[in-house]
Amino acid sequence: MRALFFGTPAIAVPSLEALASIADVVGVVCQPDRPAGRGLELKAPPVKVKALELGVPVLQPEKVRTPEFAAWVAGAGADVALVIAYGRILPKAVLEAPRRGCMNLHASILPRYRGAAPITWAIVGGETETGISLMQMDEGMDTGPVYAVRRTPIGPDTTADELAIDLGALAARVVREDLRRAVDGELAPTPQDHEAATHAALLKKEDGRIRWERSARQIHDHIRGMTSWPGAFTTIDGKALKVLAAHVESEADQGGAPPGTVVMAGRSVVVVACGAGAIQIVRAQVEGRKPLAAADLVAGRTLQAGMVLGR
């Protein structure tokens, strides 16, 4: 089986390794190197690094909607193109170029959480289970028929970063156990129930803002879902305060304290009232400063009882 691989971030690396173990990978397509770090030096994406280790040719097109790129894909003579977290929408000419088209490893149990950020929105939505769906790609956004679904639980304190690692490993299992059967026609694709679909929109910075009027459980889910980017944040004295770690302190009423009020700020605990219940902030970072334990923020008088966050 000859295969092309489309992917960019770390979550896609295990799938590339798995594909290389069962197929002749004739090319890897990933996004271009991007400036990163304080020096803004160009950094290769994780998939490119792994592809070069495997000795596979890498292509990093700035644009995928060109006749030249479609011709390159067609000329590769691939039986299938496997896509996971590539980060670009592929045109029809590319989708149809391989003999069996393009198949996608999507990080949700389709048709739920179609779109660019399924891991984050599943956690924010309080889901207790997610998975990897192997699907045939069409011109829609994750709308094609599904060959296989593998499921995994989401723990009550699991963060988006942690879940991405789990799903990366699960996707590799799908590649090893299900991809060839899908390509060979042994797995029948099942159409999705489009009426049951939900959307996982591309994240914006504002999506990270904590809405203190929500319940403690909802805010906790929001914080752990936003860990990678943009981060869950509120404001204090006009500056952004990124909440890096927290847990539900109580689901009971906080004596009428307005949502966002710091109701307790001791040596080892900072508790903030929510619309229902309260959360304990464990670790946070004031804009322009290093991350600190909440107790250190209290000691430095950054957080004090009676303050109202998010004003």
From Swiss-Prot:
Gene: fmt
PROSITE patterns for this protein: GART
EC number(s) given by UniProt: 2.1.2.9
Biological role: Attaches a formyl group to the free amino group of methionyl-tRNA(fMet). The formyl group appears to play a dual role in the initiator identity of N-formylmethionyl-tRNA by promoting its recognition by IF2 and preventing the misappropriation of this tRNA by the elongation apparatus.
Positions contributing to (6S)-5,6,7,8-tetrahydrofolate binding: 108-111
Catalytic activity as recorded in UniProt: L-methionyl-tRNA(fMet) + (6R)-10-formyltetrahydrofolate = N-formyl-L-methionyl-tRNA(fMet) + (6S)-5,6,7,8-tetrahydrofolate + H(+)
GO molecular function ontology, one term from the record: methionyl-tRNA formyltransferase activity
Name of this chain's protein: Methionyl-tRNA formyltransferase
Keywords: Protein biosynthesis, Transferase
SUPFAM superfamilies: FMT C-terminal domain-like (SSF50486), Formyltransferase (SSF53328)
Broad EC category: transferase
A Pfam family assignment: Formyl_trans_N
Family: Belongs to the Fmt family.
Lineage top rank: taxon: Bacteria
PANTHER family in the cross-refs: METHIONYL-TRNA FORMYLTRANSFERASE (PTHR11138), METHIONYL-TRNA FORMYLTRANSFERASE, MITOCHONDRIAL (PTHR11138:SF5)
Single GO cellular component term: cytosol
